[in-house]
From Swiss-Prot:
<protein>
    <recommendedName>
        <fullName>Peptidyl-prolyl cis-trans isomerase pin4</fullName>
        <ecNumber>5.2.1.8</ecNumber>
    </recommendedName>
</protein>
<dbReference type="Pfam" id="PF13616">
    <property type="entry name" value="Rotamase_3"/>
</dbReference>
<feature type="domain" description="PpiC">
    <location>
        <begin position="36"/>
        <end position="128"/>
    </location>
</feature>
<keyword id="KW-0413">Isomerase</keyword>
<dbReference type="GO" id="GO:0003755">
    <property type="term" value="F:peptidyl-prolyl cis-trans isomerase activity"/>
</dbReference>
<dbReference type="InterPro" id="IPR000297">
    <property type="entry name" value="PPIase_PpiC"/>
</dbReference>
<keyword id="KW-0697">Rotamase</keyword>
<feature type="region of interest" description="Disordered">
    <location>
        <begin position="1"/>
        <end position="38"/>
    </location>
</feature>
<comment type="similarity">
    <text>Belongs to the PpiC/parvulin rotamase family. PIN4 subfamily.</text>
</comment>
<feature type="compositionally biased region" description="Basic and acidic residues">
    <location>
        <begin position="16"/>
        <end position="31"/>
    </location>
</feature>
<dbReference type="GO" id="GO:0003677">
    <property type="term" value="F:DNA binding"/>
</dbReference>
<dbReference type="GO" id="GO:0005634">
    <property type="term" value="C:nucleus"/>
</dbReference>
<comment type="function">
    <text>PPIases accelerate the folding of proteins. It catalyzes the cis-trans isomerization of proline imidic peptide bonds in oligopeptides.</text>
</comment>
<dbReference type="InterPro" id="IPR043323">
    <property type="entry name" value="PIN4"/>
</dbReference>
<dbReference type="GO" id="GO:0006364">
    <property type="term" value="P:rRNA processing"/>
</dbReference>
<dbReference type="InterPro" id="IPR046357">
    <property type="entry name" value="PPIase_dom_sf"/>
</dbReference>
Amino acid sequence: MGKDKKASGSGSGSKGGKDAGNKDAGKDAGKASKGAQSINVRHILCEKHGKKEEALAKIRDGADFGAVAREYSEDKARTGGSLGWKQKGTLDPEFEKVAFALETSSTSSPKIGEVKTQFGYHIIMVEGKK
């Protein structure tokens, strides 16, 4: 995943502020209709499909996501695969599509997604949304 792209034309400088024109959207309803604008995301990046499958098997067998990332990931391995908080528009489009669709979960019981990008094969989990 390496380098982040700057979001172009993201317009509003507001950080999670409420829309004055959308009065009937409550806190939760606004998130459901608009979706998260940033996620706290981890991933395991593998160049080879076989290595990704090995990592997936360990996670499905109950291994901690961070521990598997440290063992298998070719990117961010030392941080347990953590990319930190990322805003919409700053990640690879294919990666972002999968990541923003995932439910939040913990490293000990991750809800994961998979995607292949120009960088390789990713196993993705999301720890938080806002």
